[in-house]
């Protein structure tokens, strides 16, 4: 602990009420956030002679200052704690790296309802089904629903302006409510009701109604209609037979955890109406010496309390470990949801099977992640050997993308010892150059990236320039002219040129623009990591360019005229 921090004097000022505390190091950085039912008692525990773990010892040794926020209740303290963790990202807290909103399937409240994927706040009138683990799961489900229940998935702007049915109607994927006379209101409403029941997990009701309609059609000698309904019944049965369904039909989130080699994986199964909608694995940042129960407890708090605006809370959460604050967490979540939320750690029956499945998936995902990291380490070691460097801890790669010189975008991607560091990927809009001048674009992005102060830990060991000798010459010129405080001679500049037929494995590498290039064998691990970071940079640049091009495509030329505001633009367009 720092000599400048007087723990005894500080503890005399601390209250015994519930609240949240923030610990700072000598640089004024928040290094830990915690909550307590009794602040005085909890903070006193940090300054005993025998501490519980090495992690706590390392934390206390760096404390320079502690700030305290008193709250009315322990529940309020729990919510505030996770808000602070999200805000400050302290290095001694377990940190959930994923904070994306989850997608839902949206059934609109229009006269002829549509199905669509939805993320974010639920403002639009209609029904929301989910959450699903990712966009792919939603799109896959929508494609399946379109085959079984042909209700529209088009945007309202398209729907309102159609005078003839589209291709989806022609291939039997939509009933065509956009054109009068193609489908009756009753038939369309019936298909919408089937979708509603199906997404709610009530497959039996869907099948019962369909079978009844098929028998009625058959009795009325409407054999084509009966055959169509029969095909629909078979499609529903094929889907429902594919997955294990709990008899309870409850909404659950099941959380399993695995830990190995200093890395944790938390796997979440999303179960709605007794069906597994999908799952997702998370790899929270875990400080050394952290107990596994703390990983689970912190993850659950951050997962639900930080993302409460975007996540629908299930009726029950099954956990792999006992929590010290299980009741507090359940009460906080219940208060947030406005209904009772159960947190269970010792399930039986189907629930135990779900927990075992989540645990197995966590272990499998962790093994895969560790294997990937091991591969990256091997490749970086091989690259360091090829480049005659002691080690490669950090690499950055640049690429340029444009269409006929327009909407030029440069990308910078970053790899560290564990592979892609996507949080540090950057795109740069390139302006003020001759259209199509890739050399000027590379010159500009390198000056913007490196012509400023850089923390020592962020100085790359290798900078890859995609484009060969000419682009490498630009990079050399930029670095020769840089006037910066950090060691600009540390990064090794490496040019990468594709082969004559631009096939992977035929790349030529250059240390100097004037020198001879060299190639690596196609099976070289060093070449593989170069190809990986170059492809990431290429994809990142193209992605940025496409977004910029789409934005320009959807922008009126009137918007570029100074002094012409939204109202005047609207008047010009209308008149």
UniProtKB/Swiss-Prot annotation:
UniProt-annotated location(s): Cytoplasm
Subunit-level organization: Interacts with UvrB in an incision complex.
Protein family according to the UniProt entry: Belongs to the UvrC family.
Signal peptide segment: none
Domain UVR: 204-239
UniProt-recorded Gene Ontology molecular function terms: DNA binding; excinuclease ABC activity
GO cellular component terms given for this protein: cytoplasm; excinuclease repair complex
SMART domains reported in the protein's UniProt record: GIYc
InterPro entries: GIY-YIG_endonuc, GIY-YIG_endonuc_sf, GIY-YIG_UvrC_Cho, UVR_dom, UVR_dom_sf, UvrABC_protein_C, UvrC, UvrC_RNase_H_dom
CDD domains in the cross-refs: GIY-YIG_UvrC_Cho (cd10434)
Name of the protein in its database record: UvrABC system protein C
Its biological purpose: The UvrABC repair system catalyzes the recognition and processing of DNA lesions. UvrC both incises the 5' and 3' sides of the lesion. The N-terminal half is responsible for the 3' incision and the C-terminal half is responsible for the 5' incision.
Keyword Transport: no
Record keywords, A-Z: Cytoplasm, DNA damage, DNA excision, DNA repair, Excision nuclease, SOS response
Any Gene Ontology biological process: SOS response
Alphabetical list of HAMAP family matching this protein: UvrC
Gene3D superfamilies: GIY-YIG endonuclease, UVR domain, UvrC, RNAse H endonuclease domain
Residue span(s) of domain GIY-YIG: 16-94
Alphabetical list of PANTHER family matching this protein: UVRABC SYSTEM PROTEIN C (PTHR30562:SF1), UVRC/OXIDOREDUCTASE (PTHR30562)
């Amino acid at each position: 602990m720092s000599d400048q921090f007087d723990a005894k004097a500080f503890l005399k000022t601390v209250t015994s009420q519930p609240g949240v505390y923030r610990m700072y190091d000598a640089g004024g950085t928040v290094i830990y956030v915690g909550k307590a039912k009794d602040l005085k008692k909890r903070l006193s525990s940090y300054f005993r002679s025998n501490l519980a773990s090495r992690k706590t010892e390392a934390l206390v040794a760096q404390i320079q200052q502690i700030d305290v926020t008193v709250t009315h209740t322990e529940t309020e303290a729990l919510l505030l704690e996770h808000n602070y963790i999200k805000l400050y990202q302290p290095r001694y807290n377990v940190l959930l790296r994923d904070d994306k909103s989850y997608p839902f399937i949206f059934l609109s409240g229009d006269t002829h309802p549509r199905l669509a994927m939805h993320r974010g706040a639920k403002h639009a009138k209609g029904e929301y089904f989910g959450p699903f683990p990712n966009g792919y799961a939603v799109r896959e489900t929508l494609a399946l629903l379109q085959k079984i229940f042909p209700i529209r998935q088009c945007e309202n702007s398209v729907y309102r302006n159609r005078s003839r049915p589209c291709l989806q109607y022609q291939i039997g994927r939509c009933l065509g409510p956009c054109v009068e006379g193609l489908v009756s209101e009753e038939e369309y409403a019936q298909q919408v009701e089937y979708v509603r029941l199906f997404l709610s997990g009530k497959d039996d009701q869907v099948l019962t109604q369909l079978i009844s309609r098929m028998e009625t059609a058959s009795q009325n000698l409407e054999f084509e209609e009966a055959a169509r309904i029969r095909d629909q019944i078979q499609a529903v049965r094929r889907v429902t037979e594919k997955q294990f369904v709990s008899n309870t039909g409850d909404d659950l989130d099941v959380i399993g955890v695995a830990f190995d080699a200093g890395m944790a994986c938390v796997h979440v199964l999303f179960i709605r109406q007794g069906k597994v909608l999908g799952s997702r694995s998370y790899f929270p940042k875990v400080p050394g010496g952290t107990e596994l129960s703390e990983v689970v407890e912190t993850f659950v708090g951050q997962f639900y309390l930080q993302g409460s605006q975007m996540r629908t809370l299930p009726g029950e959460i099954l956990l792999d470990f006992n929590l010290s604050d299980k009741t507090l967490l359940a009460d906080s979540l219940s208060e947030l949801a406005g209904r009772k939320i159960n947190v269970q750690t010792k399930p039986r029956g189907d629930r135990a099977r779900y927990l075992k499945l989540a645990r197995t998936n966590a272990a499998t995902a962790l093994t895969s992640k560790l294997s990937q990291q091991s591969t990256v380490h091997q490749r970086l070691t091989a690259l360091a050997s090829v480049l005659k460097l002691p080690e490669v801890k950090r690499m950055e790669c640049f690429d340029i993308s444009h269409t006929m010189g327009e909407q030029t975008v440069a990308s910078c991607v970053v790899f560290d010892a564990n592979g892609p560091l996507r949080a540090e990927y950057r795109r740069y809009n390139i302006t003020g150059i001759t259209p199509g001048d890739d050399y000027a674009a590379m010159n500009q992005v390198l000056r913007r990236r490196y012509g400023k102060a850089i923390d020592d830990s962020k100085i790359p060991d290798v900078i890859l320039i995609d484009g060969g000798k000419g682009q490498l010459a630009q990079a050399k010129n930029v670095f020769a002219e840089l006037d910066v405080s950090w060691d600009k001679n540390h990064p090794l500049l490496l040019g990468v040129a594709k082969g004559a037929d631009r096939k992977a494995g035929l790349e030529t590498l250059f240390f100097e623009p004037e020198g001879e290039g060299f190639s690596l064998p196609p099976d070289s691990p060093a070449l593989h990591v170069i190809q990986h970071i170059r492809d990431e940079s290429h994809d990142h640049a193209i992605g940025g360019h496409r977004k910029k091009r789409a934005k320009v495509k959807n922008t009126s030329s009137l918007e570029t005229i100074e002094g012409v505001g939204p109202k005047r633009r609207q008047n010009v367009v209308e008149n």
